[in-house]
Amino acid sequence: MSTIADPRDILLAPVISEKSYGLIEEGTYTFLVHPDSNKTQIKIAVEKVFGVKVTSVNTANRQGKRKRTRFGYGKRKDTKRALVTLSADSKPIEIFGGPVA
């Protein structure tokens, strides 16, 4: 198990999709995270970076797609996603630059 010192190294990017936008209205945010990070590290990173209170973290490991190249077949890298639910009294995270909906 590797230790990740900086919380910003754990959170790689927000996931931008219709499903993630729908979940934002319910207080759940989706992030691409470092594949070696665990739920506790993700919770601490979100609380430190955004200054909010996290109630739960769900993670999903996704296999990279198999893609055809001119040299045969290749594979995109595997990713890990984290669905982070905030407490009801936390302020919303402004990761997309403005209010949703």
Swiss-Prot record:
GO biological process, one term: translation
A GO CC annotation given for this chain: ribonucleoprotein complex
UniProt GO molecular function: rRNA binding; structural constituent of ribosome
Keyword entries, A-Z: Ribonucleoprotein, Ribosomal protein, RNA-binding, rRNA-binding
Signal sequence region: none
Pfam families reported for this sequence: Ribosomal_L23
Role according to the record: One of the early assembly proteins it binds 23S rRNA. One of the proteins that surrounds the polypeptide exit tunnel on the outside of the ribosome. Forms the main docking site for trigger factor binding to the ribosome.
Quaternary structure and interacting proteins, as annotated: Part of the 50S ribosomal subunit. Contacts protein L29, and trigger factor when it is bound to the ribosome.
Family according to the record: Belongs to the universal ribosomal protein uL23 family.
Protein name (Swiss-Prot/TrEMBL): Large ribosomal subunit protein uL23
Organism the protein comes from: Rhodococcus erythropolis (strain PR4 / NBRC 100887)
